[in-house]
């Protein structure tokens, strides 16, 4: 047996907890890498890649893509890992620890580094690491999951950004309900009673939080309040029937650390990829829903907001959308109002289930290049020198 082939996974960092909230988008990126790994000889845990010391002393090829990384103290990976550094995002929250002398030496030795975003590219180049913008490996998901347009069905709304003003304010060290917002909530609830009641039944409106992670507030009114905030905004650009017929999904999942396995999380991620690949339309603020949709040529409306794209935003880590946002057709949301600089979207007054549009084509050149690089890397019959040509 020659060199082994591994699949990098990012199991939740539990630190003693029984349940951990996990962004399944990390596993969507693993699904993209898995297309090029046949067979998968073993999983390699990203957060513990420095501890990879196989008993057989054989190296393992590993496509290293994704978000790096929670446990920065475990960087860089073991010498037994032969890495392809591609579609990497280095979090500004971890950059100082990852880019120490040892970390920079690893990146230089195994570069050039394909960067998921332009922020990471600029960051690495400032540290003397050869880097280029590769975009995200999930753009290649059409390689396996693309279906004929005639077989498309269903609509998916996945973690769309919308504002949820706090109904509780703190005054004099005590918590009080905000009177004007409560009145507005009651007014809008009565105004949009039927669609709001229908939407509030969906698990999404219990679980969703625009700030990330899952909403742990289980107050009875919360799903109705979130449904009101969503519907009164999105009805302005999306037809009522589309909003009510769509399936709502959040990428945040609760993981039971005592029973969960990598196979289960990969299966969940793959089931989402298949949904997006088969949809008539996807509406999202999640890049690991939007980019797979581009890759499988599913029409996608990307909802952007200052909170989503800002270098200082709390929707995720700063810098993660540099170079990616331009691949989408975008609706910008500010407060409760939509705007767009996209000429095609500007011509659509309201999206319905019959609205037809095509995505931009800019993503395709990145998908083609990623496919070639990953296929070449995983080829057994090429020397290391040939693979780096």
What residue ranges belong to the model's regions?
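Active-site anion-handling motifs in enzyme catalytic cores
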Residues: 1-389
């Amino acid at each position: 047996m020659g060199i082994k082939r591994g699949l990098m996974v990012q199991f939740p960092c539990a630190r003693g907890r029984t349940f951990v909230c996990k962004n399944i988008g990390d596993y969507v990126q693993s699904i993209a890498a898995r297309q090029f790994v046949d067979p998968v000889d073993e999983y390699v845990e990203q957060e513990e890649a420095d501890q990879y010391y196989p008993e057989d002393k054989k190296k393992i090829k590993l496509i290293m893509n994704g978000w790096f990384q929670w446990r920065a103290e475990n960087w860089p990976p073991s010498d037994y890992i032969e890495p392809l550094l591609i579609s990497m995002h280095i979090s500004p929250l971890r950059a100082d620890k990852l880019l120490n002398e040892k970390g920079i030496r690893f990146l230089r030795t195994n570069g050039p580094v394909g960067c998921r975003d332009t922020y990471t590219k600029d960051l690495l180049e400032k540290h003397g690491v050869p880097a280029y913008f590769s975009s995200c490996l999930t753009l290649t998901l059409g390689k396996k999951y693309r279906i004929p347009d005639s077989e498309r069905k269903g609509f998916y709304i996945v973690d769309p950004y919308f504002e949820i003003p706090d109904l509780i304010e703190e005054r004099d060290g005590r918590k009080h309900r905000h009177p004007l917002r409560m009145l507005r909530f009651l007014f809008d609830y009565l105004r949009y009673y039927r669609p709001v009641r229908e939407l509030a039944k969906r698990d999404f409106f219990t679980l969703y939080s625009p700030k990330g992670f899952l909403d742990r507030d289980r107050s009875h009114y919360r799903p109705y309040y979130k449904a009101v905030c969503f519907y009164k905004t999105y009805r302005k650009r999306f037809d009522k029937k589309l909003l009510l017929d769509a399936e709502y999904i959040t990428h945040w999942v609760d993981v039971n650390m005592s029973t969960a396995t990598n196979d289960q999380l990969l299966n969940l991620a793959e089931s989402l990829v298949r949904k997006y690949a088969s949809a008539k339309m996807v509406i999202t603020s999640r890049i690991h829903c939007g980019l797979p949709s581009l890759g499988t040529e599913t029409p996608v409306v990307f909802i952007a907001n200052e909170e989503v794209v800002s270098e200082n935003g709390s929707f995720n880590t700063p810098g993660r959308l540099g170079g990616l946002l331009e691949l989408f057709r975008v609706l910008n949301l500010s407060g409760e109002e939509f705007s767009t600089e996209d000429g095609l979207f500007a011509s659509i007054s309201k999206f319905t289930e019959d609205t037809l549009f095509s995505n931009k084509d800019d993503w395709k050149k990145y998908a083609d290049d990623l496919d070639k690089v990953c296929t070449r890397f995983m080829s057994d019959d090429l020397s290391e020198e040939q693979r780096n040509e």
